[in-house]
Each structure stands twice: as C-alpha cells, then as structure tokens.
C-alpha cells in the first residue's frame, strides 16, 4: 500500500505569514532579532526553536506566550489552493498529517475550513524528536501499516525534507519562486500544492512498478 504524508503549515494551510508575525512579536518581547529567528522556525516544533535560540528561557512559559499571540490572530487559517480537492480525493487510510503543530489546534482549523481529517496524525507532542528527525514520518507510516519506501512525503521546509529522506521515503517539496533553501535534495519540487496534485494522486493510484514522482 502506498501513502502520502503531508506537512501542514506552508503545505496544506497558508499559515506562514501569520506565524512570521507571531514569532516577530515573541522576538520583540524576549529581545531577539526576528530576521535571525524566523528562518530557524521552518519545519521545527516551536519548543525546539525556543530551546535553540533562547536556551535560558523556560520552554513552557514561552510556549504560552506564543499561543497567546496566535490566539489574537484571525481564525481559521486559510487553506492552500487545491488542498480540499486533493485531500478529498485520497483514500482515507492512505494519507496522514505529520506536523510540528498541535493536533487540537489543527482539528479546529480543519473543521472550520471543512477540510477532510485523516485517520492518522502525528503532531509535535507525539514524538520525542521533531524534524529533522525522521521519527514523525516513521511513526505515521507504521500507524498506516505502510512501509517507509511506499510513502511520499510532501514538505515545504528543509528540516522536513531532511526528515523524509532520513526516513527512507520519497520526498516532494512545495517550493514557490524564487525557491527556498535546503529543498534541492527533494526527489521533486513543485511551485505549489495545486501544481503537485497530479503527481500526488498518481503516487497513490499508480501500480508500484510504474509509479514515480517526476
């Protein structure tokens, strides 16, 4: 059986502008440079970013600050073009979400948007190590009953691409112009989820011997 493992932020949800604003507010509060911190957040769990850039601060209290800033933003976060159609077209037991975000938060966002919800989600609190560790992707494939080699990872961050490759999976990167750092090692790159939809559907529908990501 083949499966697709989706990152969420920047892939399914168009959330990066809002998250950049949230991190900028947090950086101002703790006197860090937003331009330095923001690139380090891509693909990482928030708690891992805090530990990396502010090891002197208590992670739990800083997470609450980030959540408070996020709560002030409008909800729901917008879905990426083509996300609903793609997820609705995939067999429910053949796709999962692997995200640094919170399952509780995403359940609410997906419900508000009317997006299909998967049978398997591995969120940031479900694993000991976040991306670029492959733990999340391997956990998702195991829960789906699918071998790692039969999984297609859809990512937009270098840490996620690294995690997917380390898991032994095929990796498709969502890489809008002018192109992001660290995505060149993916097996394929597309400018948007909508542009990648055909290749993702082919991965699920095609025979193992014939299927490939261009």
Predicted features by range, described:
Residues 79, 98, 129:
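Residue-level marker of regulatory loop/turn positions in helix-turn-helix DNA-binding domains and
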Residues 1-2, 94, 102-214:
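Asp-based, Mg2+/Mn2+-dependent phosphohydrolase catalytic module
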Residues 9, 36-39, 52, 73, ...:
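Short, flexible active-site loop motifs that bind/organize anionic cofactors or intermediates
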